[in-house]
């Protein structure tokens, strides 16, 4: 019998081999190419790996340990995250087939392990195209690009995005991107490879449902679905519930308005009984959201429920997420949202009375907006059809106190959403979506749908610190064409969704990495230069998307309900805001083209949260500033340490990055504002969201809003929330004309989770111990459905 020393590894083929420190070190060194070796130490990683070994460890487990070890050293230098990812990617590459077409064949030929039935994981159509074009597609893939992901990004891909057989990943990231591209473009191989390259080089990404499902047997690639309750009856309520379940099963996020459901105590004509109102019904929806988890626990189901503040059950509705109170009055898995008419805000401002009504007794309030709504509401008040009269500020205080406790409800403005919508010719828009960036018309026979993608703005900053608007416009046009194609090839879980999407053809372009873009340009987030760039970026995207949509209309005709829309009358989004665009784009020529050909898509712009896809690409989310410069983040795939890589690079170049500096940063909860020795220009550039005026954030949202024909997921951050402060922010946003006043209210925890391993008293001396983790505000993971 062969003897082994006390520690051996088990190779992939089952052979046993003695552990060799030099071999481990050599492998880590090979994967450290191009990294800053003044700060990345392969030997230090290898020493830690050796100390964690046990007898019989497999080489796969050894690689996982090495990757996690490198990831744990990210707070020393951000390039450890790249090294960690390279080790993990190398491990995956060893386990998977490098030939794209062969991997797709394996996925197509998959048989159910228990029944033996053919259960293909990619569609017959997708496989036929790949088989026919195998050589061209195989040679187009650049596997080295897998090594450009950060560890955090790669682990996110592993957890939810790469296809698995019997729980084993068989797909590489580059193969996933090519599958997605073929699923969108079919046999248009040139366009598929173009899309693959743009995603692979991280200029843009399609939304999570598209990455999950493109090319599969059920290619449900849409992110957002907006529903109106079909009718106020048992049949209507449960029909709508079934629709929500089918959509959620297919990875769609849901926005549902319940304005028309009668209030508590209303008479039920058929049985001569009385209604239990909204709350018991919403608890049923809550349980459905918990039960339907989008297949294999990829993501929990998520429903946002919208209600107008005149509804007689409004006080109970707003309290649904409270941590205390009777369980039968709570629905903590629903996301609550208010659809607020201007009249309510005016009455709060003037400290006037507010009347609560039942939609059964006061019909039509949800079917109109603006002056028509105000006239009907006043008519019902005059006729005495009111259930209850309260001070408007009493309800407002109730809303704000719940926001302080739970971060909800979302605030969306009904009149701004309708007044500035290109879909206003369809009827009254009654709600937004799960993440408050989609503003689309829905009806009992129409479920609004939106397909999303986001542009990684950091990629458009040149080495000379110039912003490449030409490339931005070029990529925007590709995305617009892609999203338009998805409308046609998409699988629709319910027919009402197909009906709506085919008629109106809305799409949603968003961004990620705006904060990274500003940092690369050396612009503090709210500086004059950043504000100007913010406007020009969104003007460019809107212009390019309109131009691409017009070119599609020239080929295929405008969308079915184009006539009568504001754009058909020459009214573009910035016209509705009363804003004059810059001279950067040739708007006069584009207006003439649109007047002649129309546009193919009713809506184009919708900056979404990008929670998951920004993690994959290593960017800060969406339009948000950084929340901290150093923190741990808990997501589905585990706990990861995140360091602001731009700041680290600056501190390293100036010789300021030391263990002591790292621990000062942790002790200051990710802020550098009070750390001595850091130059003022660095402090200004790396202000966290807690150190930026929220008034400035709202102003920048309004600036870009003139070019956003849907809306934007706008969070409000307040370290110490107060009634006065939140009220001030809401009224400022409303008066600025925002459609979405607030997505979440983000607050700091009462006690900051500073790691106990950091001894504040020892900060003046050299630190001896490695700090294993970092600090951050505690927040939910964010919406993954809308992650564009």
UniProtKB/Swiss-Prot annotation:
Site (Important for hydrogen atom transfer): 224, 450
Enzyme Commission identifier(s): 1.17.4.1
Record-marked site positions (Important for electron transfer): 743-744
KW Oxidoreductase (keyword) present: yes
Keywords per UniProt: Allosteric enzyme, ATP-binding, Deoxyribonucleotide synthesis, Disulfide bond, Nucleotide-binding, Oxidoreductase
Physiological role: Provides the precursors necessary for DNA synthesis. Catalyzes the biosynthesis of deoxyribonucleotides from the corresponding ribonucleotides.
Name of this chain's protein: Ribonucleoside-diphosphate reductase large subunit
Taxonomy of the source species: Eukaryota, Metazoa, Ecdysozoa, Nematoda, Chromadorea
């Amino acid at each position: 019998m062969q003897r082994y020393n006390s520690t051996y590894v088990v190779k992939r083929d089952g052979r046993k081999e003695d552990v060799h420190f030099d071999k481990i070190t050599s492998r880590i060194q090979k994967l450290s190419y191009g990294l800053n070796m003044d700060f990345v130490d392969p030997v230090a990683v290898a020493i830690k790996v050796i100390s964690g070994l046990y007898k019989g460890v497999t080489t796969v487990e050894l690689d996982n340990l090495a990757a996690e070890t490198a990831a744990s050293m990210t707070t020393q230098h951000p390039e450890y995250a790249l090294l960690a990812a390279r080790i993990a990617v190398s491990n995956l590459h060893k386990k998977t087939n490098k030939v794209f077409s062969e991997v797709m064949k394996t996925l197509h030929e998959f048989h159910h392990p228990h029944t033996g039935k053919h259960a293909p994981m990619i569609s017959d159509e997708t496989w036929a195209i790949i088989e026919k074009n195998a050589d061209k597609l195989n040679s187009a893939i650049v596997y080295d690009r897998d090594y450009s992901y950060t560890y955090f990004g790669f682990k996110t891909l592993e957890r939810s995005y790469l296809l698995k057989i019997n729980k084993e990943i068989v797909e590489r990231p580059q193969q996933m991107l090519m599958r997605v591209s073929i699923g969108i473009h079919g046999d248009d191989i040139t366009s598929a490879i173009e899309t693959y390259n743009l995603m692979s080089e991280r200029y843009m990404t399609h939304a999570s449902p598209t990455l999950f499902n493109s090319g599969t047997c059920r290619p449900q690639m849409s992110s957002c679905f907006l529903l109106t309750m079909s009718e106020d009856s048992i049949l209507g309520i449960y029909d709508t519930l079934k629709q929500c379940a089918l959509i959620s099963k297919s990875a769609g996020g849901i926005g549902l308005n319940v304005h028309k459901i009668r209030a508590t105590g209303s008479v039920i004509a058929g049985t001569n009984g009385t209604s239990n109102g909204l709350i018991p019904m919403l608890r049923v929806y809550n349980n459905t959201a918990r039960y339907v988890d989008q297949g294999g626990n990829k993501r929990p189901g998520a429903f946002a429920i919208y209600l107008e503040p005149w509804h007689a059950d409004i006080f109970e509705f707003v309290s649904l997420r409270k941590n205390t109170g009777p369980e039968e009055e709570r629905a903590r898995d629903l996301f609550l949202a208010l659809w607020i008419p201007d009249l309510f805000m005016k009455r709060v401002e003037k400290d006037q009375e507010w009347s609560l009504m039942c939609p059964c007794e006061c019909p039509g309030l949800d079917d109109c907006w603006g002056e028509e709504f105000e006239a009907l509401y006043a008519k019902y008040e005059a006729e005495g059809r009111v259930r209850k009269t309260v001070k408007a500020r009493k309800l407002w205080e109730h809303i704000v106190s719940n926001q302080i406790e739970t971060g909800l409800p979302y605030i969306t403005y009904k009149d701004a959403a309708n007044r500035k919508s290109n879909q206003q010719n369809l009827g009254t828009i009654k709600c937004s979506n799960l993440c408050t960036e989609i503003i689309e018309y829905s009806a009992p026979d129409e479920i609004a749908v939106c397909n999303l993608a986001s542009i990684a703005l950091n990629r458009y900053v040149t080495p000379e610190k110039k912003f490449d608007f030409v490339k931005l416009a070029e990529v925007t046009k590709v995305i617009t064409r892609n999203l338009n194609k998805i409308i046609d090839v998409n699988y629709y879980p319910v027919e009402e969704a197909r009906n709506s999407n085919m008629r109106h053809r809305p799409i949603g372009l968003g961004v990620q990495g705006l904060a990274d873009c500003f940092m690369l340009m050396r612009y503090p987030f709210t500086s004059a230069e950043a504000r100007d760039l913010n406007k020009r970026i969104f003007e460019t995207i809107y212009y390019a998307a309109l131009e691409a949509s017009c070119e599609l209309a020239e080929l295929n005709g405008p969308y079915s309900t184009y006539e009568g829309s504001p754009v058909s009358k020459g009214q573009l989004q910035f016209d509705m805001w009363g804003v004059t665009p810059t001279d950067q784009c040739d708007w006069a020529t584009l207006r003439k083209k649109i007047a002649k050909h129309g546009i193919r898509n009713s809506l184009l712009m919708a900056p979404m949260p990008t929670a998951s896809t920004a993690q994959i690409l290593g960017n800060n989310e969406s339009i948000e500033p950084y929340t901290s410069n150093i923190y741990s983040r808990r997501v589905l795939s585990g706990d990861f340490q995140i360091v602001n890589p731009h700041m680290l690079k600056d501190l390293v170049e100036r010789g300021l990055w030391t263990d002591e500096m790292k621990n000062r940063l942790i002790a200051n909860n990710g802020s550098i504002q009070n750390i001595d020795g850091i130059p003022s220009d660095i402090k200004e550039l790396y202000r966290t969201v807690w150190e930026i005026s929220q008034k400035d954030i709202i102003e920048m949202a309004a600036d870009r809003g003139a070019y956003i024909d849907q809306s934007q997921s706008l969070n409000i951050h307040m370290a110490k929330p107060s009634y006065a402060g939140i009220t001030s922010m809401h009224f400022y946003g409303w008066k600025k004309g925002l459609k979405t006043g607030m997505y979440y209210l983000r607050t700091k925890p009462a006690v900051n989770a500073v790691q106990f391993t950091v001894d504040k008293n020892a900060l003046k001396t050299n630190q001896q111990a490695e700090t294993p983790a970092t600090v951050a505000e505690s927040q939910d993971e964010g919406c993954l459905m809308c992650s564009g």
